[in-house]
């Protein structure tokens, strides 16, 4: 096979892959129902397409402090803050039993690259602040100080599809997957760079993963935020781990903006 054909194939792969938020709604692949008792740091980002339309859950996020939510840049890039709501303390997608707050500011990473999904991290500033001190259903999560070791179990939470192009569920889901070596991840995604700002996790046999609608949600290791759901090839496919924003890599960036 000559170099021209290889380049064409690589380009087709690149065009075919997208952020996992491309089709919001649904739940984690291969996971199980959970409640916000175990995931008090998880929030829903709900967005309306226009001032006259209704809000719908489009991405996840996690609480860093009373006014700061971490999510994926592709969830908020080129969007208006006034068209978002954050819902905390509610594990039902579309439910209204939690605390609903408006968004005052969106801060996507200034070097976010939508083509290769690099620096796919953003902060969402809410107003009024979340009542963390008086709430039993929401809490902030600590940021991981360093990238987790290969093989360590990580927990993903979200409302994404149960399978590629699958059906949706109203209940928050969780699944555990191991952290994958970055070099092996790069071999899988040979047509797109796996940068220092990315972290990979998943099973070689597939079956467990984040999916459409989980974007912006947390990947947690030892009760600390290690990753943010970013992108992948399909959902839960063998030999294609999920790719996450590597939160430890961005800790200084986060600190400079909160």
From Swiss-Prot:
Disulfide bonds: 59-75, 185-200, 211-235
Reactions the enzyme catalyzes: Preferential cleavage: Arg-|-Xaa, Lys-|-Xaa
UniProt-listed Enzyme Commission number(s): 3.4.21.4
Annotated Gene Ontology cellular component terms: extracellular region
Chief location of this protein within or outside the cell: secreted
Record propeptide residues: 23-27
GO BP: proteolysis
InterPro entries named in the record: Peptidase_S1, Peptidase_S1_PA, Peptidase_S1_PA_chymotrypsin, Peptidase_S1A, Trypsin_dom, TRYPSIN_SER
PANTHER family given in the database record: AT26814P-RELATED, POLYSERASE-RELATED
Protein name: Trypsin eta
Name of the gene this protein is made from: etaTry
